[in-house]
Swiss-Prot record:
Gene name per UniProt: ami
Active site, UniProt feature: H67, D115, S209
Similarity comment: Belongs to the peptidase S1 family.
Note: Was named 'ami' because of its expression pattern; 'ami' means 'mesh' or 'net' in Japanese.
UniProt-listed Enzyme Commission number(s): 3.4.21.-
Organism for this UniProt entry: Xenopus laevis (African clawed frog)
Protein name per the record: Serine protease ami
Signal peptide limits: 1-21
Class of enzymatic activity (EC top level): hydrolase
Keywords: Disulfide bond, Glycoprotein, Hydrolase, Protease, Secreted, Serine protease, Signal, Zymogen
GO terms for biological process, alphabetical: protein maturation; proteolysis
Residue positions assigned to the propeptide: 22-26
One GO molecular-function entry: serine-type endopeptidase activity
Residues modified by glycosylation: N2, N73, N74, N108, N255
Principal place of residence: secreted
Amino acid sequence: MNISRVLFAVVLVLTVSTYECRPRGRILGGQDSKEKTWPFMASIQKNEVHQCGGVLISDKWVLSAAHCATDSNNSSLHVMLGAISLTKPEQYKIVLKVEREIPHPLYNSTKKHHDLLLLELSEKVTLSEAVKPLPFETENIDIPDGKRCLVAGWGQMKSTGKKPDTLQELWIPVISRDVCNRRNYYDNEITPNMICAIEAKKDSCEGDSGGPLVCDGIAVAIVQGGYRRCGLSKKPGIYTLIAPYKSWIMETMYNATLLPSPL
């Protein structure tokens, strides 16, 4: 029996660089999100300050970007779920401690290859219409050029200025890998495990990496990095595809159930 299929079934039951790559997530040209429209969206926080986005993929696990890892003990690391506002009281908002940070073992911090991070929460989430996991893509499919997908974040909305308190969302078209690898784009730096997406003056950008790129109601990629300036038509946002890492994700979550809780 294929172990990855077995582990995927378990997860479903539980859930009901040279191109000057920088952390992304400032949602340029987006709009305020509404309550319960992003029940899977996570705010990863250190000392109660938003650091990165993430996506709830089971009742105990959040997927984010490896460059969001803290390199310190997890005592000050928490995940906020069910939130639209980072600071205002909200009926469905919950905050949970992070028990483990597990970056992909092949993560390359220079080129941001394999830029994925799993966060194990200290306890299982009580699922509701405002807090629930999002299915992620498990098949290595090509996302068509021009396909419009959703991205969201709490990062800055302008090159300078205050970060928003309200979650921003944006429809954004995917760009083919061939185009993104042209010399005047990223000059063959985009691997088969990455995709690009951008629209004029609309982009994810610095300050909110780790959130999901959602196509047809499925998380297909994680906000990764891009050029030092955001919103440039030939320097689109870069995203790490999830499907190529399906086995690592499911096996990591399964193996964690066999380990004692960290002190």
